[in-house]
Every structure is written in C-alpha cells, then in structure tokens.
Swiss-Prot record:
Protein location: Secreted, Extracellular space, Extracellular matrix
Entries under PROSITE patterns matching the protein: LRR
Protein name per its UniProtKB record: Biglycan
Residue positions assigned to the propeptide: 17-37
Quaternary structure note: Homodimer. Forms a ternary complex with MFAP2 and ELN.
Protein family: Belongs to the small leucine-rich proteoglycan (SLRP) family. SLRP class I subfamily.
GO cellular component: cell surface; extracellular matrix; extracellular region; extracellular space; sarcolemma; transport vesicle
Organism: Bos taurus (Bovine)
C-alpha cells in the first residue's frame, strides 16, 4: 500500500496531460510539454490547487471505511474488491481513491456530505450506471478520473467546478449537445479509447467549453472533427483512421501548439491546411502513409518538433523544413524524425537542415522494406 501523506501534495502539482492511464502515482506525472495550470488555462477565479487545509473543519480521524487507509484528508480504498462506494467517509475528505475495485453503480447518496472533495478516482471498476444526482454534493470537485469502466455515455450533471475529466477506455459512442453545459472551468478532457466515430459528436457538443487539452485517441475517427473548442492548445487524435487533412480541417484551431496525428492512415495533407496553425510548436505525423514532407512547414515560425518517421517519404527537398533566408523563423528545430522512410539520406543536402539547432536533432535511417 502506498504511503498516504504525499498524495495530496502530488495531486496539487499534477499536470493535465493524461497520455496513458497507469497507477495512482502516475496521475501526477507529465511526459511532455508543460500545460498551463488550471487557473491560467480556464480563466477561472477559483484556485487550482487543493483547498486551503486551514480553512477546512478538523479531520474526523475516527471515520474511516473498513479496510481503507485514511490520513490527512485522503481516503484510499483501492484494490479492495469493493462492490459499492463505502460508507463512513469523513466529510472533510479532499481526495477519495476507489480505483481497481468492482463497483458497478454510483447511487444518489454515495457521495452525500463530501462537499470538500477535490479529486475522485474511480479508475478500473465496472461502472455502467450513474444516478443523475450522484455528483450533486461534490460542489468543489475539480478532478474526476473514471477511465476503464463500462460507461456508454458521458455522466449527466457533472459538477460545475470540474477542471479535469478522464473518461477514456469506456464504451461511449455518442457525445450529445449540452452534455458539458455549465462546465466553464473545464480545461482538460481525456476521452480516448472509446468507439467514437465522427458522427458520434452532435453539433454543439462542446459548446461553452474553453478547453486547453483534448485527447480522442484510439477511437474510430476518419477525419479531424470540425466542431471542437477553438481554445485548444493541445489536440491528440493519434491511433484513429484519419486518411487526409483537408484545407479547412484545422481552420478553427489557430491556438494549437501541439497536434498529435500519429498512427493514422494519412496519405494527403492539402496545401495550405497547416497555415491555420501559426503558434504550432510540435507536430506528430509518424506512422502514417505520407509520400512526401507536408507543404507549409517552413511557414510555421514557432515549429520546433516534427515526427515524420515510419511513412513512405522518398525525397526530402532543401526547402521542405526551413524558410528561404535568415531571420524568418523565430524558433529553430530541436527534433526532426525521418527514420523508417525509404528516403536515401545520403542524397539529402546539408542545407535542408540549416534551421536545426544541432545535427543530433535529426533522426534518419533504419528503413526496412
């Protein structure tokens, strides 16, 4: 069993980058560029960290569900084979960990009295039913982790205080209009690993959201959704079935600085489609079916990282990455991956990478037919 005293501190420092669901400790780790903190990203006036413990009532140390570990307003009831949310949870609890159990339903009064709860972890249960008022008492909830369950829809009536929702690896096929209504503080949603198709997003499904981060990876998308929040800084659509990027696919997403499209079936990127991303810094197009370097990369003045490995690229032109002349690009590349492409790297002119910080930033070779 993990010691409990560091959990609250770690959760307060967590970054909203849920690339992969792991153990509880890994909820707090970040394997990429740092995100804006909750307050900066959402524009909310409320603080983004754990509530000031001095402002809360004293800890009711005698109240701890059987088999659980309770300390410093953290209640850890993971890996106990629980069939339901336990009773006798202290009302001053700020973090409730119920992952890796056999809970199948969240009932109306399961969280009654937990008005100070900041984070709720329900990962890897068997939840298929949630009462429409189950989350009503959680007026201060900011982080809800309910991945790896049996949900077929987004839970109704999510708390308006919510900042981060992780609901990947469920059975959700539809995102209806209004399901996120009133969630003005939300800045991060991880909903990959659901059998979502493009038609599953109703028009206006994300209306009102000012998201900073969205991941819909490992789904069934055949194109880039055109009605996502225009506030996005990060969009991850890797491991889908996207075949092309058309001219206006990215028109709405001018604030992106990281775009993940790896492990798709992209053969064509229409000329000019990348010009709508003036702040882009990192572009993942690895493991696709591209036959050439996408047009428009030299015009992205802030672009620093491009993943193009494992495609069908046979030629790299001298102006494919860098603009003509000096002083045009505001940030030099520090990573270009071209390995596992049928391009004869010995034929590539050295001037091709004149705007790269270091030759070690370029990855070539290792192509096998």
């Amino acid at each position: 069993m993990w010691p409990l005293w560091p959990l609250a501190a770690l959760l307060a420092l967590s970054q909203a980058l849920p690339f992969e669901q792991k153990a509880f400790w890994d909820f707090t780790l970040d394997d990429g560029l740092p995100m804006l903190n909750d307050e900066e990203a959402s524009g909310a006036e409320t603080t983004s960290g754990i509530p000031d413990l001095d402002s809360l009532p004293p800890t009711y140390s005698a109240m701890c569900p059987f088999g659980c570990h309770c300390h410093l307003r953290v209640v850890q009831c993971s890996d106990l084979g629980l069939k339901a949310v336990p009773k006798e949870i202290s009302p001053d609890t700020t973090l409730l960990d119920l992952q890796n159990n056999d809970i199948s339903e969240l009932r109306k009064d399961d969280f009654k009295g937990l008005q100070h709860l900041y984070a709720l972890v329900l990962v890897n249960n068997k939840i298929s039913k949630i009462h429409e008022k189950a989350f009503s008492p959680l007026r201060k909830l900011q982080k809800l982790y309910i991945s790896k369950n049996h949900l077929v829809e987004i839970p109704p009536n999510l708390p308006s205080s919510l900042v981060e929702l992780r609901i990947h690896d469920n059975r959700i096929r539809k995102v209806p209009k209004g399901v996120f209504s009133g969630l003005r503080n939300m800045n991060c949603i991880e909903m990959g690993g659901n059998p979502l198709e493009n038609s599953g997003f109703e028009p206006g499904a994300f209306d009102g959201l000012k998201l900073n981060y969205l991941r819909i990876s490992e789904a069934k998308l055949t194109g880039i959704p055109k009605d996502l929040p225009e506030t996005l800084n990060e969009l991850h659509l890797d491991h889908n079935k996207i075949q092309a990027i058309e001219l206006e696919d990215l028109l709405r997403y001018s604030k992106l600085y990281r775009l993940g499209l790896g492990h798709n079936q992209i053969r064509m990127i229409e000329n000019g489609s990348l010009s709508f991303l003036p702040t882009l810094r990192e572009l993942h197009l690895d493991n696709n079916k591209l036959s050439r370097v996408p047009a428009g990369l030299p015009d992205l003045k802030l672009l620093q990282v491009v993943y193009l490995h494992t495609n069908n690229i046979t030629k790299v032109g001298v102006n494919d990455f860098c603009p003509v002349g000096f002083g045009v690009k505001r940030a030099y590349y520090n990573g270009i991956s071209l390995f596992n492409n049928p391009v004869p790297y010995w034929e590539v002119q050295p001037a091709t990478f004149r705007c790269v910080t270091d030759r070690l930033a370029i990855q070539f070779g290792n192509y096998k037919k």
